[in-house]
Amino acid sequence: MPKQLMIYEDAVPISTERHGEWSVKTGADYSYARGLNSVPLLAAEFIPAATEFAIIFAGEGDSIFPSVILGMRDGENSFVGEDNAWQGKYVPAFLRRYPFVFSRSEDGGTFTLCIDEEFNGFNQEGKGERLFDSEGARTQYLENVLKFTREYQAQFNRTMQFANRLRELELLEAAQARFQLPDGQSAALAGFQTINRDKLKALPGETLAEMARTDELELCYVHLQSLNNLTPMAQRQTAAARTTEAAEPAPEKPAGKKK
């Protein structure tokens, strides 16, 4: 399952000295997400994401964090089309934040805004939005990026608290999803956890009431409901695989000898 920097190849701190003349052109190209079959999801995203994604919990111990499943097999994302466009209704904030990310100091007290210099849209030809103006000041674009990244980090911390709460209440259990491949073979997606509905319902009334007040209880049931998306997602990926196979030209037959 994913790490927080899994799509960043060369994230470096943004500075006027290094990036004063650089611009960023973003758009509908999600090729950087093609090989991701899951990405982290913030608690604030549960409701919009649950309409089409299955929300699960990845990681172990105090690193457990919610994620959305994007593909039923490693290295496959069924929401990135052949034209690299996003084919879903909702784009997770983890992907919308790219190519920017915060790096944290060793003491955890300072965050520095970084950019992945390997991003295809990072250029010195003036394409897209500049990071700094002619006087070396942040552009409005960079200010907006900084605001979004700060909000993301704040929501990340809140989501981590929610995940830790579930772990402390021992509500999570290992799970797997089974599905059929185009060739008729069965396969399974494992290595993630889900909430045990019976354990959730068996919590003391005071605990459930507290979770209801903090919206944690709603998040739990949104997660459980989202698991119904596993079957249509498997069907989506199977249909895409069959379409790809049908589009591939058949191998040419060897030429026979002339009589």
Positions of predicted regions on the chain:
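Aromatic- and glycine-enriched beta-alpha-beta binding-site module
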Residues: 58, 65-131
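A short, compositionally biased
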Residues: 49-52, 96-97, 172-175
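Residue-level signal for pocket-adjacent positions within structured domains
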Residues: 64, 74-75, 195, 206
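Short, extreme N-terminal leader segments that mark the start of a protein/domain
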Residues: 1-70
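A contiguous, surface-oriented mixed alpha/beta subdomain in the mid-to-C-terminal portion of proteins
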Residues: 102, 106-259
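Short, basic/low-complexity N-terminal boundary segments at the transition from targeting/disordered tails
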Residues: 30-34, 75-84, 155-162
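Short linear motifs in intrinsically disordered
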Residues: 43-48, 91-93, 167-171
